[in-house]
């Protein structure tokens, strides 16, 4: 035979606590103007400051990227100018060398 265990479900129920109501009468403290200023304006000023900082840093990052790409383009153009001048100088040297070679060949071998 099974015996029933004594279980007290009253422990597990939620107790109702009476709600205390605030009384809006002359006993309530006066809030200082200093605190009221921050209560009224802290959130809007914070939002404006946050948006201003986000905009500033976002535009600064964009400027850094654009400046870096501009500097890279300037370096590439300078490098291209140097390469072209080098190739022109080497071409002139080669042609001068060939002309000199042809002249000396003509001097030593007039039959050609």
From Swiss-Prot:
It is a single-pass membrane protein. GO terms for cellular component: INA complex. Its main location: mitochondrion. Keywords: Chaperone, Membrane, Mitochondrion, Mitochondrion inner membrane, Transit peptide, Transmembrane, Transmembrane helix. The chain crosses the membrane at residues 45-62. The keyword Signal does not apply. It is found in: Mitochondrion inner membrane. GO terms for biological process: mitochondrial proton-transporting ATP synthase complex assembly. Belongs to the INA17 family. Component of the inner membrane assembly (INA) complex. Interacts with a subset of F(1)F(0)-ATP synthase subunits of the F(1)-domain and the peripheral stalk. Component of the INA complex (INAC) that promotes the biogenesis of mitochondrial F(1)F(0)-ATP synthase. INAC facilitates the assembly of the peripheral stalk and promotes the assembly of the catalytic F(1)-domain with the membrane-embedded F(0)-domain. This is Inner membrane assembly complex subunit 17. It comes from Schizosaccharomyces pombe (strain 972 / ATCC 24843). The gene is ina17.
């Amino acid at each position: 035979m099974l015996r029933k265990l004594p279980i007290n479900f009253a422990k597990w129920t939620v107790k109702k606590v009476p709600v205390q109501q605030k009384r809006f009468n002359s006993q309530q403290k006066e809030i200082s103007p200093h605190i009221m200023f921050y209560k009224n304006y802290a959130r809007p000023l914070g939002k404006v400051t946050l948006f201003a900082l986000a905009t500033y840093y976002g535009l600064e990052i964009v400027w850094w990227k654009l400046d870096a790409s501009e500097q890279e383009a300037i370096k590439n153009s300078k490098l291209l100018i140097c390469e072209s001048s080098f190739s022109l100088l080497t071409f002139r040297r080669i042609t001068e060398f060939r002309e000199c070679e042809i002249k000396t060949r003509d001097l030593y071998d007039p039959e050609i």
